């Protein structure tokens, strides 16, 4: 299977650069896999697509303000992009470093408010292991001095408003460097309305990493290796998912991160195990879904692993017809754009 088979033409002006004033003012494309039909409603109407007994599983990860700048002791500005915390004790992180001259082990970086960093050595791929001091209060320092890590296709600097709008209303667990964007459309009122309709809402955590922005660098889909991301599935969530396997209702995944986590933890009978770990699951056409019955997701980049996942779930022909419709109807694409309900 060729990566180029997942390409499509997207006018640049359809890439959303700002969120709408209201989270639920976005548009929702509906994709019926059984009937092969594509429709459209307002996102605030999504509750009528649920049935009593359904389970909505959401990713409660919270995006950290992971981007900031410093100056090397030897001179020269450096941009630091935190990817993940490496040590349970101390502030040792896997980071991207950007500067005019390459970094090397032993490089020291002077940061705001008396904080400093030292490059320890290479980590995975293009990343570095970096140690920060002092370690006390580093999360608070980051909140004051870091910027939200907006995706590269948003052609502007992060603003104060992004600290709220690039988070879901149910974000709790700090650790992501990209938002689970399908969740950005939900308001507390919509979640309450779902509960009133007899829908159960459960949480899991998958800390979205830098790999979500990384292009595929091979020609064949099967040769690609996914980045690994940390996840937690609470016992209550596993129990709620497993109850649906007895016919109580559908398991509806809010976003590809939730979908990947559930499928990673699923057995052949669709039941999932509670626990914590890392997943590098890569889902593309030909994959047999074990536990997810419906998927809410945003529109994804051409030739991306996320587009391949949704192609596997919806069927590639139907999905690309839906994307063609979305372009024709001038839907807004990517993180701050519109959404899709595939069922």
Swiss-Prot record:
The lineage of its organism: Bacteria, Pseudomonadati, Thermodesulfobacteriota, Desulfuromonadia, Geobacterales. It comes from Geobacter metallireducens (strain ATCC 53774 / DSM 7210 / GS-15). Belongs to the QueA family. Transfers and isomerizes the ribose moiety from AdoMet to the 7-aminomethyl group of 7-deazaguanine (preQ1-tRNA) to give epoxyqueuosine (oQ-tRNA). It is found in: Cytoplasm. Monomer. It catalyses: 7-aminomethyl-7-carbaguanosine(34) in tRNA + S-adenosyl-L-methionine = epoxyqueuosine(34) in tRNA + adenine + L-methionine + 2 H(+). InterPro entries: QueA, QueA_dom1, QueA_dom2, QueA_sf. Pfam families: Queuosine_synth (PF02547). Its EC number is 2.4.99.17. The keyword DNA repair does not apply. It is an enzyme of class 2 (transferase). Its main location: cytoplasm. Pathway: tRNA modification; tRNA-queuosine biosynthesis. It comes from the Bacteria. GO terms for biological process: queuosine biosynthetic process; tRNA wobble guanine modification. This is S-adenosylmethionine:tRNA ribosyltransferase-isomerase. SUPFAM superfamilies: QueA-like. Keywords: Cytoplasm, Queuosine biosynthesis, S-adenosyl-L-methionine, Transferase. GO terms for cellular component: cytoplasm. The keyword Repeat does not apply. PANTHER family: S-ADENOSYLMETHIONINE:TRNA RIBOSYLTRANSFERASE-ISOMERASE. GO terms for molecular function: S-adenosylmethionine:tRNA ribosyltransferase-isomerase activity.
